[in-house]
Regions:
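Catalytic domains of carbohydrate-active enzymes, especially glycoside hydrolases
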Residues: 187-216, 223-226, 230, 234-239, ...
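Catalytic domains of carbohydrate-active enzymes that cleave complex glycans
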Residues: 476-698
């Protein structure tokens, strides 16, 4: 039996990182005689789901599906699942005599993660295969000289995905989508349980054990409860956005005010209203296994609790200076609310919650830093980054070591920044995680993954480093990721090209300290390559031309509107560097179902050579390049140039749909709807031509 070269590379690297001097037996898989997957003792349902996943992986590779059996372990030709040892999610994957692979875990999740580790490191299955189309290579058989992988307690106990501002997911497979009941334009629908299945499978394959199943989940809405049930069935703990104490967001409160015919109230004005709402939702969430509770106090649309206006209003952003005594009073009220929430959760559960946390954000972080905010005993304090996933604020930076259980909230994607593109390099993420881990933030990491699909490279890397910070290497990870797509011989070339991609859009100087926002951050560059800011600034210009007011509070930007040439040149240079670095190393292998890029024959050639290996990076580089040109043209009043760029954006979206499966992916881009810009620009261009014609007549 012959070992597939890409899988061998993955296996060799992974095993060398976790074993030293451990002898193990040879193990092989052949389509002629598939090993059975043997579950020798009762396991929770999510372990059986994982076994089915691995059986499916083996069927894709070998053309035959292994049988899953229970009871006594076979002595020959089997993959045996059992529990052994102690610790949190520990596991071992070892080949034994008789062509047996034994996967043991200290608990059920340990067994599950051991299975998925075998799939990724030995079978070569990309955790994001569903989203990126990178399926494992077919083979009649494979053989490993030995397999011995051991994983102790993970570096971070809870490792959570946050599905946030998920406009693409909500438009994907609309036939299975459900209805929401909150008054929020972006969230009139919620993606269906079939989509959640793919999300949760990817999360556990990537090593995550917790999830915020969607933004603003309403557990009492059956369509949203289905998502929670799917996540639980996959072995994922449930947690919440920092706006959702006891599972209640400000949008739920706003709906309740309307249903009851009430005027909006703050917690200070009507605490009993909130107590009743928290109690009602805590009782529902108490029936869900594995909840990491959220406590805290924020207003509608993630505003301070004393602001009644929602996020649509500019008033919601105001942060006026107030006397110290006012800050102390506000902090005391938040502390009082948190203690009440713990009391309500305790009543709902019948015992004090085992896991509960509060996320420090804006005024919460400020009050805590000043010593005004007192949290209930046992609260895990979650510190937040600066949104682009690049630094942590002074509330974390000023502490040598955290005195309480601590964690971090980290953005690999962010709605007012890189919402559709990967811009945070794994190297930087590793620096941030290591910095926080050394201070004692080991309890939980919540990673914002937005719409999931665009972020496979960076999210998979985050999963690996959360498992074992000490052994993670960004360069090694990139090479292994590349080897799945192009093989060992070309892996370094693709890995170098990916490094060049991140370098072209580097947001923070490597000398910057991760502990604070700092003056050295190149703000203009940060604003330049950022899809959220580029859309917002372009939309501002169009609104001014249309004579309307902007309907969204704009993100501040340092891009000079009077120098569009500099913007265009920077985008052009970054795009050129990325494509030039990538193109020489990639095999020419384009699937018949994939369409080439339309901008020019040169781009079409590059795209064909990239697919299906580095397509996401090529797409995201072009996305940023065209968005930059669109803004530059609009700022210069070049409406024909802006129209060309807007149409190119539409074409780029269409090309990335990759067949019937993804044809609806961009249908509900409500947050930054680049697709709507072409029609608006066309009207403006027509008006401008009319004005010019009248001037010529004069």
């Amino acid at each position: 039996m012959k070992l597939h070269r890409a899988s061998h590379l993955l296996f060799a690297i992974s095993v060398s990182a976790v074993t030293a001097g451990v002898a193990a037996e040879q193990f092989g898989i052949s389509s002629r005689e598939m090993p059975r997957i043997s579950v020798v003792e009762p396991m929770r349902p999510f372990v059986m789901r994982a076994a089915q996943d691995i059986a499916g992986d083996m069927e894709k590779i070998f053309g035959a599906r292994p049988e899953i059996v229970t009871g006594a372990a076979p002595e020959q030709n089997a993959i045996v699942l059992a529990k052994a040892g102690t610790g949190w999610e520990n596991y071992a994957v070892e080949s034994m005599p008789g062509n047996v692979l034994k996967i043991t875990g200290s608990d059920d999740r340990g067994v599950m993660f051991g299975l998925y580790r075998f799939a990724s490191d030995c079978l070569g299955v990309d955790p994001f295969y569903y989203w990126n189309g990178c399926e494992p290579k077919r083979a009649a058989s494979r053989e490993w000289k030995s397999i011995s992988i051991r994983q102790g307690d993970p570096s971070f106990k809870f490792r959570a995905w946050f599905i946030n501002d998920e406009d693409s997911l909500n438009g994907y497979h609309p036939e299975t989508a459900g209805k929401r009941t909150i008054d929020y334009e972006r969230y009139q629908v919620v993606f269906g349980p079939e989509v959640e299945e793919h999300i949760c499978e990817t999360a556990v394959r990537a090593g995550f054990n917790a999830i915020i199943a969607a933004s603003y989940v309403d557990i009492l809405n059956p369509d949203e409860r289905k998502l929670v049930d799917v996540a639980v069935s996959r072995g994922l703990f449930q947690t919440f956005h920092h706006q959702e104490p006891c599972g209640v967001s400000g949008w739920i409160a706003k709906r309740e005010w309307k249903l009851r015919g009430m005027q909006p109230v703050t917690y200070a004005e009507d605490p009993e209203f909130f107590h009743g709402l928290w109690r009602r939702y805590a009782e529902a969430w108490a029936k869900v296994p594995g909840v990491i509770w959220q406590i805290g106090l924020r207003g509608v649309g993630d505003r301070p609790y004393w602001v009644k206006a929602d996020w649509h209003s500019a008033d919601g952003w105001k942060s006026a200076e107030v006397p110290e005594e006012v800050e102390r009073e506000r902090a005391a009220l938040i502390s009082k609310a948190m203690n009440k929430q713990v009391e309500i959760i305790t009543d709902a559960l019948g015992h004090r919650p085992e896991h509960f946390a509060t996320q420090l954000w804006l005024e919460g972080a400020q009050f805590f830093r000043k010593g005004y905010l007192k949290v209930p005993e046992g609260t895990c304090i979650i510190y937040a980054d600066n949104s682009p996933g690049l630094k942590f604020g002074p509330d974390a930076g000023r502490q040598k070591r955290f005195a309480t259980p601590a964690g971090l909230y980290y953005h690999l994607a962010v709605v007012h920044g890189n919402h559709y593109t990967q811009l945070v390099p794994p190297r930087r993420t590793h620096e941030i995680f290591s910095y926080m881990h050394e201070k004692g933030a080991k309890e939980i990491v919540i990673v914002n993954v937005s719409n999931v699909r665009p972020f496979g490279f960076t999210v998979t890397a985050a999963g690996e480093m959360m498992r074992d910070l000490g052994s993670f290497s960004a360069a090694d990870y990139a090479r292994r990721w590349a080897s799945l797509r192009v093989g060992e011989g070309r892996a370094k070339g693709l890995a170098d090209a990916i490094d060049a991609y991140f370098g072209a859009y580097e947001l923070v100087d490597s000398r910057d300290d991760v502990s604070s926002y700092g003056a050295k951050t190149p703000r203009a560059k940060l604003a330049l390559f950022n899809d959220g800011v580029l859309y917002a600034r372009t939309d501002d210009i169009l609104c001014e031309m249309e004579g309307g007011a902007t309907d969204y509070v704009r993100i501040p930007s340092d891009i000079p509107t009077d120098d569009p040439d500099a913007l265009t040149d920077a985008a052009k240079d970054a795009w050129h560097a990325t494509t030039q670095d990538m193109s020489p190393y990639l095999k020419s292998r384009a699937r018949s179902s994939e369409r080439a890029y339309r901008q020019s024959a040169a781009f079409a050639t590059v795209a064909a050579r990239l697919r299906p290996y580095g397509t996401e990076f090529l797409h995201q580089a072009r996305f940023l390049s065209i968005a930059s040109r669109l803004y530059a043209a609009a700022a210069a009043g070049d409406w024909q140039g802006a129209l060309w760029a807007a149409r190119e954006r539409d074409a780029l979206d269409a090309e990335m749909c990759l067949g019937e499966e993804w044809r609806r992916w961009y249908d509900r881009h409500l947050i930054y709807p680049f697709r709507t810009l072409a029609a608006r620009i066309e009207k403006i261009a027509e008006l401008e031509r009319g004005k010019q014609g009248k001037e010529c007549e004069k």
